[in-house]
Each structure stands twice: as C-alpha cells, then as structure tokens.
C-alpha cells in the first residue's frame, strides 16, 4: 500500500542538484559582498562613508536671470540703470558683477558699453566705478567712438580726467591715438568743438598735436583755421603744432586763411610759416588752351566720305 513520504524526507526526494540550486539563491539574496572584502578594504570603506559631507556649491557666474535679460534695444539691466541715472542701484550692480568682464563690457544694439553710457549721461563717478570693476575703455560704439571720444565731443573734463587716469603707459598711448570711423582722434574732436581745456590736457598727456585725419590730412591746427578759432590756434601753437604741415592736397594752415575773415589768425601763422607755403598754388595757365585744337581726335570733321565709289567734297 502506497504511503506519503514523511515531512522530513522532502529534501531527500528533491535530490542533491535541487538543494544546491536553492542554496545559491539564498546566497545571492543575502550576501552583500562584505564577506568577500578584506579587513583593510572594509575599514577604508567605513572611513569614506563617515567623511561624506554635503557642501553647498556656488552658482556659476552669470547664471543670475537678470544678467540674461535684454530690452529690444539690446540694453542690459546695467545699461538701463545708468540710462535712468539710478546711481545707488548702478553702484550695487557694479559691485556684484565686479570682474565679470563679459557682462561689464556687453554692448547694446548701438555697440555702447555701460561705460559709453556713463559718459553720455555725464556720470564720471559711475565711469570710474566701471573702470575699477574691469570695463574696457578702448571698446568702440557704432560710430567708432571710444568713451574718451564721447567725453571730448561733449566737453566733459571730469570724464576725460577719469578715462585718462594712469593705467599703464601703453594703454594711455593707445587710447589717445585711437581714431573713430571718421578718422578723428580725441584731440581732433576736442578741437572741432573748441574745448581748449581738454585740448591742453590731452596734449600734456601725450596726444599727437600733429596727427592728421585720413580724409584729407588735416591736423588740429588746420581744423582750428577752418573753424576760425584764434584762441585755439594760439593754444595749439603753444603746444608745438607744426605750422608747415600740409594736407594731402598740399595746403598749409596759413593757406587756408585766404578768403576767411580772421586777420588775427593770418597774422599768427604768417610769422611762422615758410614763404613757399603762404601763397595759394597757382591755377593752370588758361592760355595753354589757345594752342590746342578746337576738337578732340574723335570730334574732327570727316574729310574722306565716299558715296557710290565717288569721293564727296565737303
């Protein structure tokens, strides 16, 4: 008669292979790997776990949302603060972004940096703070003007003083000799607008008083004659302007006085200008045209017309 196996005999009925498989499953479920580690490795792992700390990380520079926002004119938050002359706010922004050159030198749609706008709005103290924070004074706007060009054009002596503060000999020389897209240096602009104090300051700092603008080679002295400004002429002569420097067409400053009302300027320059640079160049001799034919070669009358094989007499 068949009798069921007793509970204690189940393992024997499964066989040795099934028992080994079950044992491996238990090992895989419960073994964390610690038993296979050496004592030294285990101690090192415990030490590293104890040393784990959560440290706050600073957000990367420029990640602040307000730095990325621009108006339709391309103005940043700093541009707007300067335009609206919010000085306290501007100073706080400059303090926060000090050293962030990409933001400080960002140019709007007119290629104006915050430094350009500080000069335009006549805020020399803001301009000074921007320079200390890292603004580049040699960047140009859409007309090729550096901030110093604008200061000279507007006649803001305080801004000129801030922008020409000692920051290295090479830097100062570069900014003084820079020309805008019309070819004018800062000295040219100061001369054109008649700001004598700025002219004197620029020359004392090393500006080339005889620099020629590229359009026709006029120097500041030529410009002073064109503008009929005798006080500027006197100052430029005092600063060492060359009265015998000629334009690309060969005109000296004295020759530009002919036909102009200021006899004072003519007297000032006449005493110093070479004799051959005082008279206007002679015009072409009109009599030379009398000996020339009335017609050019292409306009001479025909004398060899032929019709039907017969020469025509004209």
Curated annotation (Swiss-Prot):
GO terms for molecular function: identical protein binding; NF-kappaB binding; nuclear localization sequence binding; protein sequestering activity; transcription regulator inhibitor activity; ubiquitin protein ligase binding. This is NF-kappa-B inhibitor alpha. Belongs to the NF-kappa-B inhibitor family. The modification Phosphoserine is found at residues 32, 36, 283, 288, 293. Phosphorylated at Ser-32 and Ser-36 by IKKA/CHUK and IKKB/IKBKB; disables inhibition of NF-kappa-B DNA-binding activity. Phosphorylation at positions 32 and 36 is prerequisite to recognition by the SCF(FBXW11) and SCF(BTRC) complexes, leading to polyubiquitination and subsequent degradation. The gene is NFKBIA. It is found in: Cytoplasm; Nucleus. The modification Phosphotyrosine is found at residue 42. Residues 1-41 are annotated as: Disordered. One of its GO terms (cellular component) is nucleus. It comes from Sus scrofa. A motif (Nuclear import signal) lies at residues 110-120. InterPro entries: Ankyrin_rpt, Ankyrin_rpt-contain_sf, NF-kappa-B_inhibitor.
